[in-house]
Design a protein with these regions (language model features):
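Sec/Tat signal peptide C-region and signal peptidase I cleavage site
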Residues: 17-21
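Short helix-capping/linker turns of helical repeat alpha-solenoids
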Residues: 30, 34, 47-52, 64-66, ...
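TPR alpha-solenoid repeat register
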Residues: 54, 90, 126-128
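Hydrophobic face of amphipathic alpha-helices that form TPR/SEL1-like repeat modules
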Residues: 22-29, 44-45, 55-64, 93-100, ...
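Terminal, low-structured helical/coil segments at or just beyond the last alpha-helical repeat
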Residues: 127-173
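Canonical positions in the second alpha-helix
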Residues: 44-45, 81-82, 118
């Protein structure tokens, strides 16, 4: 088991707190409908700190035209970045853009792949979307997609399951 010193924990908290505070501010602006401020805050985080959920919100704002002109291609770019940070909501949205051909080429195989990765996280919309995407693919396409899915789930799927009955131990070195 990995051990963390109290100093490491303190430094990690101090380093990550400003990004967390900025993200929380961005979410508040978004929920209050102040999309221009939300966009500015999220854009800074998404670009400089590589924050997955900030990237997801960037995709949402581009997709809906909130605080920025609607641009499905840019939405796809941000959903892809967030998807690669294991954000299941972004994986669903990316699959949906591929399925509908909005900002990205209509590609049922890519849609099926990203819906499947989202479903590995047990994201309910992804679980349901797999069925409709699957009906659009041939047996050959499904076989090819399944190879990619296995690789993507390892990279972008849920990480190690945590047993809630086991406490997380932080020990001094």
């Amino acid at each position: 088991m990995r051990k963390f010193s109290p100093l490491f924990i303190l430094l990690f908290t101090l380093i990550t707190s400003p990004a967390r505070a900025d993200f929380n501010d961005g979410v508040v602006h978004y929920l209050m409908g102040d999309y221009e401020k939300a966009f500015t805050t999220m854009q800074s985080l998404a670009e400089t700190s590589d924050h997955g959920y900030a990237q997801y919100y960037m995709g949402m704002m581009y997709m809906k035209g909130q605080g920025v002109d609607q641009d499905y291609k840019s939405a796809g770019k941000w959903f892809r970045k967030a998807s690669e940070k294991n954000i299941p909501q972004a994986q669903y949205k990316l699959g949906d853009l591929y399925f509908k051909g909005r900002g990205l080429p209509k590609d049922f195989e890519s849609a099926y792949i990203w819906f499947s990765v989202g479903a590995a996280h047990k994201h309910p919309l992804s679980v349901n979307a797999i069925k409709k995407a699957k009906t659009k693919l041939s047996e050959e396409e499904l076989k090819e997609a399944d190879k990619v899915i296995a690789s993507y789930v390892k990279k972008y799927g849920p990480k190690e399951e945590v047993d809630p009955k086991q406490p997380i131990k932080i020990e001094n070195e």
